């Protein structure tokens, strides 16, 4: 009489363990290396320092001033938006990341859309990127849910 209850509890515990493990795995797959470092309290000084030379503009046919400006330009958007890129687009500073909640995200998104809305002369592409940045951060583990 007690054996079916014990078996039922065992099966339930195994099922809950598998479910929580799968949920943790799906969250882990969406994390960027920079976010993983932050969650583990690992300080990264300059994550792109190793790639700076690869991005240098090396043409000898242009003047030095223009070459310096091109070397400082980091490029356009990544093919798939990352959390750091979304934070830059929505102008969320390092201090604000610790307090990032739905209210702050909505405020920053609204401010960016007011500045870049297509009805006010902004680019539709930029407006789409702002919306994409908001969606990325809504799915992010950086966002504090209430």
UniProtKB/Swiss-Prot annotation:
A GO cellular component term found in this entry reads: PAM complex, Tim23 associated import motor
Q: Spell out the subcellular localization from the entry.
A: Mitochondrion inner membrane
Q: Please, which domain of life does this record's source organism belong to?
A: Eukaryota
Give start and end of each J domain.
Answer: 85-146
Which terms under GO biological process does the entry name?
Answer: protein import into mitochondrial matrix
Task: Identify the main location.
Answer: mitochondrion
Give GO terms: molecular function aspect only: ATPase activator activity
Keywords attached to this entry: Chaperone, Membrane, Mitochondrion, Mitochondrion inner membrane, Protein transport, Stress response, Translocation, Transport
Q: List the disulfide bonds.
A: none
Reported function: Plays a role in mitochondrial biogenesis and protein folding. Participates in the translocation of transit peptide-containing proteins from the inner membrane into the mitochondrial matrix in an ATP-dependent manner, probably by stimulating activity of mtHSP70 (SSC1).
Q: What else is known?
A: Present with 573 molecules/cell in log phase SD medium.
Q: How does it assemble?
A: Interacts with PAM16/TIM16 and is recruited by the PAM complex.
Q: What is this protein called?
A: Mitochondrial DnaJ homolog 2
Organism for this UniProt entry: Saccharomyces cerevisiae (strain ATCC 204508 / S288c) (Baker's yeast)
Name the gene behind this protein. MDJ2
């Amino acid at each position: 009489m007690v054996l079916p209850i014990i078996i039922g509890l065992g099966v339930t515990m195994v099922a809950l363990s598998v479910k929580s493990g799968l949920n943790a795995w799906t969250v882990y797959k969406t994390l960027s290396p920079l976010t993983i470092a932050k969650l583990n309290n690992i300080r990264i000084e300059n994550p792109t320092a190793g790639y700076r030379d690869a991005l240098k503009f090396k043409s000898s046919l242009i003047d030095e001033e223009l070459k310096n400006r091109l070397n400082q330009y980091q490029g356009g958007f990544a093919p798939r938006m990352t959390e750091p890129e979304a934070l830059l687009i929505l102008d969320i500073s390092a201090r604000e990341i610790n307090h990032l909640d739905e209210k702050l995200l909505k405020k920053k998104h609204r401010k960016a859309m007011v500045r870049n809305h297509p009805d006010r002369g902004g680019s539709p592409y930029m407006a789409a990127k702002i919306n994409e940045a908001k969606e990325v951060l809504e799915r992010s583990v950086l966002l504090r849910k209430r």
